[in-house]
Amino acid sequence: MTFPLFITLLILTATLIVMWNKLRKARRAEYIRSYSLPDGLFERLRKRRPELTLKDCQLVSHALRQFFLAYLKSGCKFVSMPSQVADDLWHEFILYTKNYDLFCKSAFGGFLHHSPAVVLSTAQQNNTGLRRCWWHTCREENINPRDPTRLPLLFALDAKLKVADGFHYVADCRSVRRKSTGNDSGGAVYCGGDFSSSSFDGGTDGFGDASSADGGGLGDGGSGCGGGGCGGGGD
């Protein structure tokens, strides 16, 4: 085999691998978007949150899909959950053990472990996961993650549904800086613009990192999604 032919075959192989990875990611994303949640899941959520209507539960399920898509699009890197009520639905979904295991294998190629909902703090791993989640949910809704004019659903959800213990966000940090929300929750307000700031832990890891590329990196072995170590820590 001549050297030019070898280089040509190498380039062709690399191109085919990239195309195959993109196709697989697209198939997995469509699977997440169209997946039918197990029967009875909303009823279990409403036992935790009796104030939720069926329409509210459907909105929560849409937000949870955003979280799963963020994990997929990150290359199956660690992502943190920003919503208390979406976290509740995620936790209830996990209790459907067989359904959740099959979902994870089909959507990610491996199991996604649960990690509790968090906000920006001094905990660097959680912050990295939140920034990564923010980046990909913004891109999902065509929002500029560096200068947002509105919030992606996953970050707006707790305030929208008036979740008493929820994490309430605003897009514009210049007008509100962790004041009382003025609603029934009486909680703090968190700012979308803070995800590009290094003031919390001295860095911006996870914000628009290399995982945000739409290329490959989703191999079941090399992506970190091939076994039991995907996502965050256990409960």
Name these PLM-found stretches.
Residues 77, 81-160:
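Short, structured secondary-structure elements
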Residues 8-18:
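Alpha-helical membrane-embedded segments
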Residues 34, 59, 235:
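Polar-ligand-bearing catalytic/cofactor-coordination segments
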Residues 1-9:
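Feature marks short, highly hydrophobic, charge-poor N-terminal signal-anchor/signal peptide-like helices
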Residues 29, 33, 48-52, 56, ...:
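Conserved aromatic-histidine-acidic binding/catalytic patches
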Residues 149-235:
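Short hydrophobic helical membrane-anchoring segments positioned at the boundary
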Residues 42-78:
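Acidic, Ser/Thr-rich low-complexity segments on the non-lumenal side of membrane proteins
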Residues 16-40, 44:
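Transmembrane-cytosolic junction motif
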